[in-house]
């Protein structure tokens, strides 16, 4: 039976793709058949004359996933904007059915699917006709989430807002990861302590050198999948 997790963030460019890649690489190193999936990617790149899904390609390389990265993304959009706007500009429409189909395909290949979101948790995928938001996808797939946030000043507000929105939408959060964490920073250490106290959730850290406690990640994410961690 496939299990999965959805990686979201407090915003754009806080390190969601990097954390996703580290989690998958760590799980694979622990003997877990883990894979990657993303519903929509904005801002394709060109490599060796071929259009590629940059985030997916990075994760595949970093984590050592075999296969074609572009096949791990349902909708690839050239314009680097919110998926709903990029799709509108390219005369495309993002709908739920293909996303579910592609996630199920990934679930047939991997025992654990790490799905990366686009931007933050409040991300529109389609606003023309039937509205489709990222939370609709998370709920349709019945996934829990990991919230990635920057460790610096302002993260208490953005992290708690993201968490409370998820809770209001009946989406469970498995843990929070503070990225670019500097243990010598009083602000970073206090942010971690305050967020743990105010949320009751485990707050993990990814240091400035990119270290992440993958054994703890494994225990948190796979608690319901494995009889023994």
Q: Where do the protein language model's features map onto the residues?
A:
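N-terminal phosphate/diphosphate-binding loop that engages ATP/GTP or pyrophosphate donors
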Residues: 18-93, 97, 102-105
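Conserved catalytic-core segment of NTP-binding enzymes
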Residues: 23, 112, 117-203
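Glycine-rich phosphate-binding P-loop
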Residues: 6-20
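C-terminal binding/interaction regions
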Residues: 192-225
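Short, hydrophobic/glycine-enriched beta-strand segments
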Residues: 4-9, 36-38
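Short, high-confidence coil segments that cap the C-terminus of an alpha-helix
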Residues: 2, 32-33, 106-111
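Cofactor-binding loop segments of dinucleotide-utilizing enzymes, especially the Rossmann-like FAD-
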Residues: 10, 39, 150, 178-181, ...
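Short, hinge-like loop/turn segments at secondary-structure boundaries
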Residues: 51-57, 164-166, 192-195, 221-224
């Amino acid at each position: 039976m496939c299990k999965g997790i959805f990686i979201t963030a407090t915003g754009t460019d806080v390190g969601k793709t990097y954390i996703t890649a580290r989690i998958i690489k760590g799980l694979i190193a622990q003997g877990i058949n883990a894979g990657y999936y993303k519903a929509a990617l904005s801002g394709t790149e060109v490599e060796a004359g071929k259009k590629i899904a940059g985030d997916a390609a990075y994760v595949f390389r970093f984590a050592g996933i075999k296969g074609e990265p572009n096949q791990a993304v349902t909708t690839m959009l050239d314009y680097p904007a919110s998926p709903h706007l990029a799709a509108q500009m390219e005369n495309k429409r993002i709908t739920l059915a293909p996303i579910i189909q592609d996630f199920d395909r990934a679930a047939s290949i991997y025992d654990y699917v790490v799905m990366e979101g686009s931007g933050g948790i409040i991300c529109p995928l389609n606003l023309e006709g039937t509205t489709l938001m990222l939370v609709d996808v998370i709920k349709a797939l019945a996934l829990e989430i990991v919230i990635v946030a920057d460790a610096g000043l302002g993260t208490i507000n953005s992290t708690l807002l993201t968490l409370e929105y998820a809770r209001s939408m009946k989406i469970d959060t498995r843990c929070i990861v503070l990225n670019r964490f500097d243990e010598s920073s009083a602000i970073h250490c206090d942010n971690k302590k305050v967020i743990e106290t105010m949320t009751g959730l485990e707050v993990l850290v990814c240091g400035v050198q990119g270290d992440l406690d993958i054994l703890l990640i494994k225990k948190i994410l796979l608690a319901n999948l494995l009889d023994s961690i």
